[in-house]
Amino acid sequence: ESLIEAYREMLPDATETELAIELGTDFTFKIPAIRLAEDRVARGADTWVYQFDWESRNAHLKATHALEIPFAFNMLMATGVDAFIGKGELPQAVADEMHGVWTSFIQGDEPSWPKYDLEKRTVQHFDNNSSVVENGELPRLNAWEGIR
């Protein structure tokens, strides 16, 4: 089975453009980040993984690279951020949650979700309704096995 066929199975309603974006995102960001987490765990390092899923109201951006930065630093009101996150009510609850996790971690506290391990592969997903997911990316990881 080819990588593209695997993605078509995982995302049956995706257009060709959406499939290309998913493949590119995973190649550039997601798979390397997961491989780094796997390597850290294999070396005995405490590791937590998060994924920022809140989608910009700018339809072309979705949950694009670096969109989480104004949330992590609680800077949704900063000049120019609205161009990045889109117009409308500020998603302050998401920023409060993410900023709280980051500042607690900086101060030496552990995140509230379980550490990443090679069995459960726990990931915290930040969104309007944040959640903790186990093995959510396993089909993608399996598709990339031996490739990246």
What name fits each language-model region?
Residues 108-136:
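Mature extracytoplasmic/periplasmic domains
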Residues 131-148:
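Tryptophan-rich aromatic "cage" segments
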Residues 98:
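C-terminal catalytic lobe of FAD-dependent flavoproteins
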Residues 1-89, 101, 108:
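Substrate-gating cap/lid region and adjacent catalytic-acid/histidine neighborhood
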Residues 92-95:
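Conserved loop-to-helix N-cap of the C-terminal "lid" that shapes the substrate pocket in Rossmann-like
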Residues 10, 122-123, 142:
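Small/flexible residues
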Residues 54, 102, 113-115, 144:
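Tryptophan-centered motif/residue detector
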